[in-house]
Amino acid sequence: MKDKIKDFVLGLGVDNVGIAAVKDYKSPRSPDLQGIFPGAKSLVVLAYQELSNCESENMQIAMGGRLDILEFARSSNYRVARFLEREFKTKAITVPPSYPLHMSYETRGTVGDVSLRHAAVAAGLGNFGRHNLVIHPKMGTRVVFTAVITNLELPSDPPTTEKLCTDCNICVENCPAHALDEEGKTDDMKCLKNSQPYGIGSAIRFWTKFAESPTEEQKKMVKDVNFWRLYQAGSIGFQYFCFNCMKSCPVGQE
């Protein structure tokens, strides 16, 4: 059964796939999967190679590569879920690679309903590096994950036991926000302020100032390039301006 599922996934052009039993999925911050999908028993975790776009200093090109993956990933997720439902008469739900996220004062939009990193580790697709990202045995850190949760009972794939991180500290040295200074923790707010400069924080500041400004100043504000960038980032859903921790990691790039 697992081989049939994996053959289907790989036939879509997905780079790798792993399977994890829900009991082996351990995420310290994300909610219990049973609250999302009562009766959930397994996760089918899909892995996608990040394109070389991430190396570009042109952030439009870099982000364009990520958007390409996200579009393909959503389509693949849907097709895998439908395959499971059709072939095995089971229920399946998709877990997106990013947004939508639960927005609350507690999580501040930084905690996913499913931790795809922990799901990937549980599915044998790698282990954590110093940058707190998952390192895949072949693709290194340049990998994006999605998942499909099902009530089909499947055993977990063997874990990746080899330590893949070389502790070179290049990721820490290349983080302009110093979000990785404390080992074992990513300072989400420092990271987001730098990597998403036109995210929700900037939008709040812009619209607060806009509301408090006279009409003539408001006209100037909406004609300013800062507003244009906010508009574009909002239209995309989010827009990264930093891929340093991912692209600087040497593992898998030899």
Which residue stretches match the model-derived regions?
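Non-catalytic, usually N-terminal nucleic-acid engagement modules in DNA/RNA processing proteins
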Residues: 1-75
